Amino acid sequence: MSASSSGGSPRFPSCGKNGVTSLTQKKVLRAPCGAPSVTVTKSHKRGMKGDTVNVRRSVRVKTKVPWMPPGKSSARPVGCKWENPPHCLEITPPSSEKLVSVMRLSDLSTEDDDSGHCKMNRYDKKIDSLMNAVGCLKSEVKMQKGERQMAKRFLEERKEELEEVAHELAETEHENTVLRHNIERMKEEKDFTILQKKHLQQEKECLMSKLVEAEMDGAAAAKQVMALKDTIGKLKTEKQMTCTDINTLTRQKELLLQKLSTFEETNRTLRDLLREQHCKEDSERLMEQQGALLKRLAEADSEKARLLLLLQDKDKEVEELLQEIQCEKAQAKTASELSKSMESMRGHLQAQLRSKEAENSRLCMQIKNLERSGNQHKAEVEAIMEQLKELKQKGDRDKESLKKAIRAQKERAEKSEEYAEQLHVQLADKDLYVAEALSTLESWRSRYNQVVKEKGDLELEIIVLNDRVTDLVNQQQTLEEKMREDRDSLVERLHRQTAEYSAFKLENERLKASFAPMEDKLNQAHLEVQQLKASVKNYEGMIDNYKSQVMKTRLEADEVAAQLERCDKENKILKDEMNKEIEAARRQFQSQLADLQQLPDILKITEAKLAECQDQLQGYERKNIDLTAIISDLRSRIEHQGDKLEMAREKHQASQKENKQLSLKVDELERKLEATSAQNIEFLQVIAKREEAIHQSQLRLEEKTRECGTLARQLESAIEDARRQVEQTKEHALSKERAAQNKILDLETQLSRTKTELSQLRRSRDDADRRYQSRLQDLKDRLEQSESTNRSMQNYVQFLKSSYANVFGDGPYSTFLTSSPIRSRSPPA
């Protein structure tokens, strides 16, 4: 009865102070009926990133017996018989082969560990693939950074080229403006020269008309002189002056005087015209100088304003280029920050994924351990139930044997009945313990279900996070593709602009090449104009000479007129004298008709006087001939000047034609300049469109950065939620583990109480059953055998401890093994 009762009370060793256990492996040693059963459970967990090792070991021994070294048996005989006629109680100890055969190395199989290792290998492969993907992404990011740097360098080179192009365009615009001003000056000078030529032509026509009038007057005076000459010649031939001759002389004299007066008037008008011409020329020169100075001042002001505008435009362009460079730098910084944040987010997410996978693996291992512990609890409950059944059967047998053997000892029977009642109470306690174990099993099942649910939630969160990561990666790829497209479009635009700039360069070179002969022609035209001006000046000098000659001729004509007046006066005097002489001669002829001898003297005197008059007439004729020669020289000179004027007109017409050709070329150049200005406007429009596209791309980048920021915030919030959930699950698991530890402690207290009760029962049994020492000796032998098995198990456990200590090293597991209650147990004295 005592053996059965001692076999029916299993022992639960107290756990260590660290208390957190996880069951992974199980070893149950069963003996036949009456043999002690030892259940050894042990676990280990291979954690990731500093996870602790949790081990629970429980050795259940029925009774406490003296220590016996392993491999030795008791000194007493194997079989002990207690004979009492007419009954015989035979006790056979269990064979060591059965005990040893129960414990096998196959029970220490690591199939679950292999499956866990497979999962861990899979996770490692996944992590390696993720790390490879991260490495690829990093390399891509580096390549993108290199491409961005190359693009930046290319853009800077293109900017420098654009600045050079802008500088050259400014130079070409300046040259074009200078050409325009020169062409305008040429046009103005041309118009001014045309007006001058028209005015000179009008003045020339006026002078020519006045000269023609003067020539006509001179010719009329010459005719009158010739008429006087003829009349004087007639008078010579006739030698007698009639009234008609006198009248003709007087008439010719009057006509000559009229012609001379008209000649004087024409000379005066010519002098007035020449004076007016000189005054006009002086005033025109002054006006031209004043207009040229005003034009120069206006041109200087316009050049100053244009240069100021160009400086302002260049400053604006420089500011715009600086703003573009700053925007591109900000974009590069934002892109680098985005790439860095994406890399950090990737690393953070990968670390979180690894931690989640490690936690999932740990939770799976914990779930498996819980399942194993549940199965162990079930097996333990079944073993306890079987032991209870065996104990009941054994108790019934013992009762029957004791009733048959000890009928006389009623007191012992009553005591045994009381003991049986106590055993029934213990059985009830065991039933309660089984119920509690079942409740704990149900709680573990609920916990397992909750853990499975949490695992599913975590997997869903991981899937969502992976989707977000893929979305972010896709968004980054789309952004990079857009940036590449924008960069390609900018490069294409730059190529187009360079091609257009080269075309502009060629056109400018062609225009310059065409401008050189135009400049030569313009210089030739200027030289011709200067030659014309010099010829005009020469003509003016000639006109001055002619004026001086005309003045001389006027003076000579005045002298001739004075001489003619003198001659007229002398003629009048002579006529009067002749009349007087004729009258005197008549009177003398009448008075001295008789004096015929005096007539030849008078004739000689008259002949001498006539000879003198003829000499005077010849002198006058000579003077008239000289005057006619002078007039013919003047006519020849005027004709020569007319030829020169015609040559000048022809040259002027040729210069006008050349000026027309030059104006046509200038118009073509102006058209080309207008085309270039239109192309410049188109370039400005293209640049404005490019700036608008850049601004739109900047806005898109800002939107994408905002979206990335919102996504990063969402990721951070999701990660924080996952962390909170994981912490909550950890806290929940810790609380459950603490509750389990508390329950284990309660069970240990109950076991200690049962142990104390058993010790009291043993004392009472020893005090009451001293007579049954033989049976007690048998029981002691059996207990020694069980103790030997326990010691062998302890040695095996010690071997396992040393092996696990060698495997796991120093740590909480070794401290737990050293603090195990099995080692501290000492054999009874």
UniProtKB/Swiss-Prot annotation:
Region Disordered, annotated ranges: 392-413
Q: Which organism is it from?
A: Homo sapiens
Q: InterPro entries in the record, alphabetically?
A: Odf2-rel (IPR026099)
List the gene name.
Answer: ODF2
Record PTM text: Tyrosine phosphorylated. Phosphorylated by TSSK4 on Ser-95.
Q: Tell me which family the UniProt entry assigns to this protein.
A: Belongs to the ODF2 family.
Q: Does the keyword Ubl conjugation apply?
A: yes
Q: Which regions form coiled coils?
A: 144-217, 245-423, 461-798
Q: Where is this region: Interaction with BBOF1?
A: 537-701
Q: Which residues form the signal peptide?
A: none
Q: Location of the Glycyl lysine isopeptide (Lys-Gly) (interchain with G-Cter in SUMO2) covalent cross-link?
A: K138
The Gene Ontology biological process terms listed for this entry are: cell differentiation; centriole-centriole cohesion; cilium organization; protein localization; regulation of cilium assembly; spermatogenesis
An annotated Gene Ontology molecular function: structural molecule activity
The protein's name in its UniProt record:
Outer dense fiber protein 2
Return the GO cellular component terms, semicolon-separated: centriolar subdistal appendage; centriole; centrosome; ciliary basal body; cilium; cytosol; intracellular membrane-bounded organelle; microtubule
